Regions:
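Acidic catalytic loop of the alpha/beta-hydrolase fold
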Residues: 142-147
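Glycine/threonine-rich phosphate-binding loop and adjacent beta-strand/alpha-helix elements that clamp
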Residues: 165-166, 194, 206-478
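Short beta-strand immediately N-terminal to the catalytic nucleophile in serine-hydrolase-like folds
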Residues: 1-3, 139
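Histidine-bearing beta->alpha loop at or near hydrolase active sites
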Residues: 168-185
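Accessory cap/linker subdomain of secreted extracellular hydrolases
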Residues: 16-131
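Active-site-adjacent alpha-helix of alpha/beta-hydrolase-fold enzymes
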Residues: 148-169
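Short glycine-enriched nucleophile-adjacent loop
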Residues: 8-19, 348
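Short beta-strand/loop motif that positions the catalytic acidic residue
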Residues: 132, 138-140
């Protein structure tokens, strides 16, 4: 079996059933846990995915199947293009949205199941790896919305797949772009993988050829090379024996400021271990207000679908960084190239005036010419701070809590002269549904409160991003 997206789900659902004639699977751009990392992310509803995908990919097909005319389908598509971005995503409550009842009623099931429960467990790939006895050629892209689950599928199959053949034969191929390409800038060249990877996999497991596939590289990773100026970057492929790559080192960069890190014009600093006690950065915290009626707009990122209305991928962040509800922490220019390859994690301390709220972190590359681009971003809901599979627990207002957040996976060169930047806020809309800050069910209510947020970064509450650094990975000479 082969193909991607929804057809990737089909493969992951079929393989645990062990159909007798299934020899191998090759799923692409699809995750593992369809609750966390798909319809929800750390407890937050993936609003854009959950509305744009049914509106564009499911409902037109269902209309044709129901006997509706091309004119009716065209009228629907016009309705979507006129209303999805400007109207539908703003409607509250989420459960009151009425456009999908006839042809995409599963949307309301998604909204009705914000917690991981039996609804999600029955389709959860991440619990079924021991039942899968065939190898998987797993592929994805760094700007795909399901890349966290893609990597998890590879890791799960390699470690606990249901047969030696499944464990030893599973491979990972990660390219550059989004779910169906993307319109982002900068670009990163042609990330088409070597076609022999697939052919050798198929020849070995479908035809039974003794072609030495077992000795081929385990992972193939496309490394992004951003430009120093302009919007034309490049990239190159590397191989390895695992993901993360053996020999990966972790470098922590700490959030600091003089107490006014709001906007990219503020005094936020991202400092390495050697500079974390610099007396210039003595302010213990930064503050901002999060208003659900004026959320931070989504600018690029790992999204699906309808990139015409909401572009995905790498985009310049400099305009949105002028908002006062975004804290911005920037390093000094890097003295040499740094290969960041692996899983990026963040640990931070936060307080809120609300019983529940969200926090977002974004990793940004600042180019020497002043342009920027997002590398990774992620969100976490306060009530799910201990994990999306555990019972949600509201926070006590104005009390500090530690959050750990996996931003995702990447392979990029942070080039000499570039700066590392971290943005902290509480929304990315309409990528994610807004937390209304009331502590009530965000999916079935519409009352909103403004939350007063504090990010702590003193000695007792260190907040930092952890970057996976791989030595000796350099940009090939042209």
């Amino acid at each position: 079996m082969t193909s991607g997206s929804y057809l990737g789900i089909v493969q992951w659902q079929a393989a645990p059933l062990r159909p007798p004639h299934l020899a191998a699977i090759a799923p692409s751009v699809m995750g593992s846990d369809y609750h966390d990392g798909n319809v929800y992310v750390n407890g937050v509803f993936s609003l854009w995915l959950s509305q744009s995908w049914p509106a564009g990919a499911i409902i037109p097909d269902q209309m044709f199947r129901a006997g509706q005319s091309s004119a009716q389908v065209n009228a629907w598509n016009t309705l979507v293009n006129e209303n999805l971005f400007t109207n539908w995503v703003w409607q509250l409550p989420l459960s009151g949205f009425s456009e999908f009842h006839q042809f995409a009623s599963f949307y309301y099931d998604w909204v009705a199941h914000p917690n991981y429960d039996a609804y999600w467990a029955k389709i959860d790939t991440s619990t079924r790896y021991p039942d899968i006895t065939v190898p998987a050629l797993v592929s994805g892209d760094w700007y795909d919305p399901f890349q966290v689950g893609t990597v998890q599928n590879f890791q799960g199959m390699r470690s606990i797949g249901g047969s030696a053949k499944a464990r030893q034969g599973t491979r990972l191929v990660m390219g550059a772009y989004g779910h169906s390409g993307d319109s982002g800038t900068p670009t990163f060249g042609d990330d088409t993988p070597d076609p022999s990877i697939q052919m050798r996999f198929y020849d070995h497991y479908l035809k039974g050829l003794d072609n030495g596939f077992e000795s081929d590289p385990i992972v193939h990773l496309y490394v992004l090379v951003p430009p120093n100026s302009g919007n034309t970057g490049s990239g190159f492929w590397i191989t390895g024996d695992d993901f993360p790559l053996p020999g990966t080192q972790i470098a922590n960069y700490f959030l600091h400021s003089g107490g006014h890190a709001n906007t990219r014009l503020g005094d936020g600093v991202l400092a390495g271990d050697e500079d974390r006690h610099d007396p210039r950065y003595r302010a213990p915290a930064d503050r901002f207000d999060y208003d659900p009626e004026d959320p931070v707009p989504t600018v690029g990122g790992n999204m699906c679908c309808n990139g015409v209305l909401l572009p995905a991928g790498a985009l310049d962040q400099s305009a949105v960084e002028l908002r006062n509800d975004i804290l911005v922490y920037t390093s000094t220019p890097l003295p040499h190239d740094v290969a960041v390859i692996g899983t990026v994690n963040a640990t931070f301390w936060a307080m809120t005036s609300a019983r529940d709220t969200d926090f977002t972190l974004k990793l940004v590359d600042v180019h020497p010419d002043g342009l920027t681009h997002n590398v990774l971003d992620r969100i976490v809901r306060a009530r799910f701070r201990e994990g999306s599979r555990l019972p949600p627990e509201l926070v006590e207002p104005n009390q500090p809590y530690q959050y750990t957040l996996e931003l995702g996976n990447t392979a990029t060169i942070l080039r000499a002269g570039h700066q590392i930047r971290v943005e902290v806020s509480s929304s990315s809309f309409p990528h994610y549904a807004r937390n209304l800050n009331t502590g009530l069910d965000n999916n079935s209510t519409e009352a909103v409160l403004v939350a007063h947020q504090t990010i702590l970064h003193d000695k007792e509450h260190p907040s930092f991003i952890a970057l996976p650094i791989v030595p000796n990975v350099t940009i090939p000479s042209s």
